[in-house]
A protein has these predicted regions:
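Glycine-rich dinucleotide-binding loop and its adjacent helix/turn
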Residues: 2, 103-106, 151-209, 304-318, ...
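C-terminal, flexible cofactor-proximal segment of oxidoreductases
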Residues: 2-5, 291, 308-389
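N-terminal Rossmann-like FAD-binding beta1-loop-alpha1 element of flavoenzymes
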Residues: 22-49, 191-208
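Short hydrophobic core segments
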Residues: 25-27, 147-159, 193, 279-291
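Short beta-strand "acidic-cap" motif of Rossmann-like dinucleotide-binding folds
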Residues: 46-52, 212-217
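Glycine-rich active-site loop/strand segments that organize a redox cofactor
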Residues: 53-108, 216-234
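A conserved short coil-to-beta-strand element within the FAD-binding core of flavoproteins
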Residues: 124-138, 254-266
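A Rossmann-like FAD-binding core segment of flavoenzymes
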Residues: 208-302, 359-373
């Protein structure tokens, strides 16, 4: 079992851990943090700690009340195929929650249950203020002191770091990640900037409530021919767009980049790069995605041209040994690991690298994870398109 601490996912955090040294500290207690922690347990690594500045699954719990997972859950474990939303072998959100498309709050509760079941050592309400490596040890600064670890897995995700830039006046808009419930929004005429999953989700719920929506995107995600949902819309979103209420109340503006948003006498004025002007008395919604938490540790990684961290085949920093990345910010060449069913396949890669550095035998561990499709080390199989028929 993991090393015991003075708190867990259901208890209060303590500053006593500041005097401890760990083999691994995982920053972030979301799907990636909890999932990679379980992989460490299975690999035989015991002396580790998960820290989160809030609570287990808090980013999921903060999603709009109506927002659901676009990836469906199904209890397919009996035939050796993991539920798409599972973060660990033997677990199926569909089975435990009896829900195909869970809400954020439902999945947060699911993560908390898993953390408790595996007795994972979690220090909640622990905000990492700084990370530096001195000699062979990482020093993680908190309000209560310094945590020491030989390895760090950065799994803080993206949701708490919304992208608020992109055009003049973007600060006048409200990011969709800050909306508690679309049903609670005042106004009858909404301008939504960003037509990928978050934008379509917002438009769906608002139009279902009889609100008028104009949805803008610099591209046209709903027209993409690729089968990769990292680029094109999910099947779940396409189905929603075919609902009568969506067609009646939502007007799409593809290939229409927004140049500015201004506020004039209580009226929001949206201008597009091609000169069109749209007005509304309702604050525009910004669905432009997330900048990601990896910016916080940019000094510990080289940077790709797209701004994401450069990582090795083991998802380790190429300039700071022992610093690993896990979760939706993982990139390898053109492959984007932004969904749970994608980035979970890298948990065991990281766990094996750390376990091997501690001289722990990992052959059986790797075989078990490979048998469940949870060990993706051959990226040549990625990027395959579906047949058109």
């Amino acid at each position: 079992m993991p090393k015991e601490t003075n708190s867990n996912a259901g208890g209060e955090s303590s500053s006593d851990a500041a005097s401890d040294e760990y083999d691994v500290i995982i920053v972030g207690a979301g799907a990636a943090g909890v999932g990679v922690a379980i992989a460490l347990v299975h690999a035989g690594v015991e002396n580790f700690l998960i820290v989160d500045r809030d609570t287990v699954g808090s980013s999921f719990a903060a999603r709009p009340e109506e927002t659901k997972f676009i990836t469906p859950s199904f209890p397919s474990n009996s035939i050796g195929m993991l539920d798409l939303n599972s973060i660990a072998i033997g677990i199926s959100p569909a089975f435990t929650m009896r829900v195909e498309h869970p809400t954020g709050k439902q999945f947060a509760a699911h993560l908390q249950d898993i953390a408790n079941y595996f007795e994972l050592p979690v220090e909640e309400d622990t905000d990492i203020k700084s990370i530096e490596k001195i000699d062979d040890m990482f020093h993680l600064g908190t309000d209560d002191g310094v945590l020491l670890s030989k390895n760090v897995i950065w799994a803080a995700g993206e949701y708490q770091y919304p992208n608020l830039a992109g055009f003049e006046g973007s600060d006048l808009c409200r990011h969709t990640s800050t909306v508690p419930s679309y049903g609670g929004l005042e106004g009858d005429d909404f301008l939504i900037i960003g037509g990928y999953e978050s934008g379509v989700d917002a438009a769906f719920h608002l139009s279902a409530n009889g609100k008028e929506v104009r949805l803008f995107d610099m591209n046209a995600p709903w027209e993409e021919t690729t089968s990769d949902p990292s680029v094109a819309l999910s099947t779940f979103s396409f189905e929603r767009m075919r609902k009568p209420s969506f067609g009646q109340h939502t007007e799409l503006y593809p290939n229409t980049p927004v140049s500015s948003v201004t506020l004039d006498n209580g009226v929001y004025v949206l201008k597009t790069e091609d000169g069109q002007i749209f007005e509304s008395r309702t604050q525009p919604l910004l669905a432009g995605g997330f900048s990601g938490s990896h910016k916080f540790v940019s000094h510990l990684f080289e940077e790709r041209e797209d701004g994401f961290p450069v990582i090795s085949d083991q998802d380790e920093s190429t300039i700071t040994p022992g610093m690993y990345l896990s979760g939706p910010s993982v990139r390898h060449d053109g492959h984007v690991f932004c969904f749970i069913y994608k980035y979970r396949q890298r948990f065991a890669i990281v766990a094996q690298a750390i376990a091997s550095s501690m001289d722990i035998e990992t052959d059986d561990f790797v075989d078990a994870y490979k048998s469940w499709g949870m060990y993706l080390d051959d990226l040549s199989c990625c990027g395959q398109e579906c047949l058109t028929c």
